[in-house]
Every structure is written in C-alpha cells, then in structure tokens.
From Swiss-Prot:
Protein name in the entry: Enolase-phosphatase E1
EC number(s) per entry: 3.1.3.77
Cited CDD domains: HAD_EP
Organism: Xanthomonas campestris pv. campestris (strain ATCC 33913 / DSM 3586 / NCPPB 528 / LMG 568 / P 25)
The protein's required cofactors: Mg(2+)
Membership in a protein family: Belongs to the HAD-like hydrolase superfamily. MasA/MtnC family.
PANTHER family, per database record: ENOLASE-PHOSPHATASE E1 (PTHR20371:SF1)
Keywords assigned by UniProt, alphabetized: Amino-acid biosynthesis, Hydrolase, Magnesium, Metal-binding, Methionine biosynthesis
Disulfide linkage: none
Known function: Bifunctional enzyme that catalyzes the enolization of 2,3-diketo-5-methylthiopentyl-1-phosphate (DK-MTP-1-P) into the intermediate 2-hydroxy-3-keto-5-methylthiopentenyl-1-phosphate (HK-MTPenyl-1-P), which is then dephosphorylated to form the acireductone 1,2-dihydroxy-3-keto-5-methylthiopentene (DHK-MTPene).
Record note on cofactor: Binds 1 Mg(2+) ion per subunit.
Superkingdom to which the source organism belongs: Bacteria
Enzymatic reactions: 5-methylsulfanyl-2,3-dioxopentyl phosphate + H2O = 1,2-dihydroxy-5-(methylsulfanyl)pent-1-en-3-one + phosphate
Pathway per the UniProt entry: Amino-acid biosynthesis; L-methionine biosynthesis via salvage pathway; L-methionine from S-methyl-5-thio-alpha-D-ribose 1-phosphate: step 3/6; Amino-acid biosynthesis; L-methionine biosynthesis via salvage pathway; L-methionine from S-methyl-5-thio-alpha-D-ribose 1-phosphate: step 4/6
Name of the coding gene: mtnC
Length: 232
C-alpha cells in the first residue's frame, strides 16, 4: 500500500490526553462561562452563538438561563457547535494569560513534525471549534505546532460519526478518500471514515484506555498505542 497523500487526525484521546480536556479545559470553561457571557454577551459573535443556544431550547430566555444551559451541556459533554465556539473563546483567554498550555503526547508531536517535513499534508477534525483547535496547537506543551496543519475542520462540516462528513472533508482538501489516513480513538468515528473510503487507525493509548479495546471492537482498523507504531 502506498503512503497516504494526507493525514487527518482527531485531538482528544489521539494527539492529546482525554484527561487534559476533561480535567482542565472543561472545568475552566464551566467556571468562566457566567462572567464571560455577562461581560461579552453584547458582542455580535458571542450573541450569535447565544442565540443558537436559545433556538435549541426553544425559548426566548434571559442570559442567566443560557449560562445554566451551557454549563449543563459542558457537564454532559454535548457536542453542540455553539457550546464549542463559546468554549473556544473562553479558552483563548486562558491560553493567552498562560493559565494552562495544551497537552500533546510527545510521540504525536514528533511524528506530526516528521510527516510535515516529509511533505505529507496534515489536517485536524475535532468536535472542538476550529478557533479552539488552532489555539490548542499554537499553545501546546511542545510549542507552537499550528504551522504543521494545512486546514482544520469541526462539526460545522458535519457530525464525526457520519460518513458524509468525511466525504465532505475529502472534497474540500482535494484528496481522494482512499488516500487519506484518519486517526482517532473513537471506533464509531473510524467506522464512519472507513465507510467514506478512508484508511483508518485506532489510537488505543494506555493512558486513556487502561483496558485495550478487543479485536472484535477494533475490527479492520489498524490499532496502535502511539504514533510511533503507525504503519503508513
């Protein structure tokens, strides 16, 4: 099999630890959400996303209700585009004030840089908003890695468990789906990418999944525990 013409990667559980997102980013956004909405709710971009939240719950409600709804969605890990956009805005403040830096596994940082040096285009597809993705890579533990990525995709391109989303990405980057390798820790996402024709690899990191996924669950996906084990 020839080397892929492009690599598409997830972030949480793939390039970076699940615990960083769950234990650092989500709680930070939850704590900061009330003050952020009260202070910036009049900004057109912020109001755009707040209006989407109001549309979702089907009511003309005050901001305090929207704040409570957003915090509940954080607790539920809802993959709602408006929530992800607002979280990204809040995290931008945290990155810029150095309240935290984004975790990235050493093997992922090294391999992403190696693939970039070899001329393999790299793309990111995450449920986090595109601005949040860019901040994540720009403020990583390994330094600014944002320049390695050719383009970014979030749930505005479609849900991550639907094959149509991956077909859309292939069309946008101009690479045939069979020539794209998709990396993720979520089997359902890999299944969707494979149905779209992409090559797939499951990141089954012991740090995130102490009990390895079974062969039945992994199916036809390549299974690795780090980026260094990937066979292109």
């Amino acid at each position: 099999m020839t080397r892929p013409q492009a690599i598409l990667t997830d972030i949480e559980g793939t390039t970076s630890s699940i615990s960083f997102v769950k234990d650092v980013l989500f709680p930070y956004a939850r704590r900061a959400m009330p003050a952020y909405v009260r202070e910036h709710g009049g900004h057109p971009q912020v109001r755009h996303w707040l209006n989407q939240v109001a549309d979702e719950i089907g009511e003309d409600v005050p901001d305090e209700v929207l704040i409570t709804t957003l915090q509940t969605w954080i607790d539920e890990d809802r993959k709602h585009t408006a929530l992800k956009a607002l979280q990204g805005m809040i995290w931008e403040d945290g990155y810029r004030t150095a309240d935290f830096s984004a975790h990235i596994y050493t093997d992922a940082a090294i391999q992403l840089q190696a693939w970039h040096a070899e001329g393999i285009p790299l793309y990111v597809y995450s449920s986090g908003s595109v601005p949040a993705q860019k901040l994540f890579f720009a403020h990583s533990d390994a330094g600014d890695l944002s320049g390695l990525v050719s383009d970014w995709f979030d749930t505005e391109v479609g849900p991550k468990r639907e094959s149509s989303s991956y077909r859309r990405i292939a069309e946008r980057i101009g690479v045939p789906a069979p020539e794209i390798l998709f990396l993720s820790d979520v089997i359902e996402e890999l299944d969707a990418a494979k149905r779209a024709g992409m090559r797939t690899a499951l990141l089954d990191r012991l740090e995130d999944y102490p009990t390895p996924r079974s062969a039945d669950d992994v199916g036809s996906h390549q299974r690795v525990e780090s980026f260094t084990q990937l066979v292109l």
